[in-house]
Amino acid sequence: MSVFDLFRGFFGFPGPRSHRDPFFGGMTRDDDDDDDDDDEAEEDRGAWGRESYAFDGSQPPEEFGFSFSPRGGMRFHGNFGFDDLVRDFNSIFSEMGAWTLPSHSPELPGPESETPGERLREGQTLRDSMLKYPDSHQPRIFEGVLESHAKPESPKPAPDWGSQGPFHRLDDTWPVSPHSRAKEDKDLDSQVSQEGLGPLLQPQPKSYFKSISVTKITKPDGTVEERRTVVDSEGRRETTVTHQEAHDSSRSDPDSQRSSALDDPFSILDLLLGRWFRSR
């Protein structure tokens, strides 16, 4: 007896090792059981039913199985309560749409939602309907009140954060003027005529620097040309050119004469071999 036969006998499954077994038919069919299948063919047909049981579902209540109905559904038979389980799942899935979907579809606002004051009056252009008075030629009506007669609301003062800012400790180094805190439109022409440009134009830090570049050029005749260029922070450039003759450099700097002599190959041979020829 195989493990599947023991499992089938424990749960009360009929028909051991049937080629019609939908669960264990392909797994339990061995070469040694071919002879037993021929003898038990009639018993298997009675256990699982033929065409008469395929559509009416009239199997004994102690057997377990399933059949296909003519309507295209699958029906389980047995004492395991599969019919109730499938029925419960169908009721859950049918009610799931009521939990997720809205009860009514959203509606787009129609033209009746517009108020009469917001509609374009006859003879009024699109520009006049969008701009505020007095930029537009005709004032608009809001809730029965003309735009020109409406009282302007007093602007709210800007919040003074004071020491609550993240860099309040740097206020002593870079003080913030009160004009930079206010975020509102101002008439700068009248303010300049009354107070001048001093309060508006804040002093800006200036940096001073100077750049010096020196270039020396040695010509073939030994003349040295030196260019000294000085550029300051304001962009002024000053260039000084100095020429130094060859005989002046030989008198003032003996090392330069030796270095210039080493550049000539004949001078090098004279230094190396001159002693031998002069001594002889």
UniProtKB/Swiss-Prot annotation:
Residue numbers spanned by region Required for localization in mitochondria: 2-45
Cleavage, annotated site positions: 128-129
Single GO cellular component term: mitochondrial matrix
Region entry Required for localization in sarcoplasmic reticulum, spans: 184-280
Matching InterPro entries: HAX-1
Membrane disposition: Peripheral membrane protein
Region (Involved in GNA13 binding): 177-248
Keywords: Acetylation, Cell membrane, Cytoplasm, Cytoplasmic vesicle, Endoplasmic reticulum, Membrane, Mitochondrion, Nucleus, Phosphoprotein, Sarcoplasmic reticulum
Ranges for region Involved in CASP9 binding: 176-207
PTM sites of type Phosphoserine: 190, 193
Main location: mitochondrion
Region of interest: Involved in PLN binding: 204-226
Spans annotated as Involved in ATP2A2 binding: 204-246
Region: Disordered, residue numbers: 12-70, 100-263
Keyword Nuclease in record: no
GO biological process: one example: positive regulation of phosphatidylinositol 3-kinase/protein kinase B signal transduction
Subunit note: Interacts with ABCB1, ABCB4 and ABCB11. Directly associates with HCLS1/HS1, through binding to its N-terminal region. Interacts with CTTN. Interacts with PKD2. Interacts with GNA13. Interacts with CASP9. Interacts with ITGB6. Interacts with PLN and ATP2A2; these interactions are inhibited by calcium. Interacts with GRB7. Interacts (via C-terminus) with XIAP/BIRC4 (via BIR 2 domain and BIR 3 domain) and this interaction blocks ubiquitination of XIAP/BIRC4. Interacts with TPC2. Interacts with KCNC3. Interacts with XPO1. Interacts with RNF217.
Sequence similarity: Belongs to the HAX1 family.
Entry protein name: HCLS1-associated protein X-1
Name of the encoding gene: Hax1
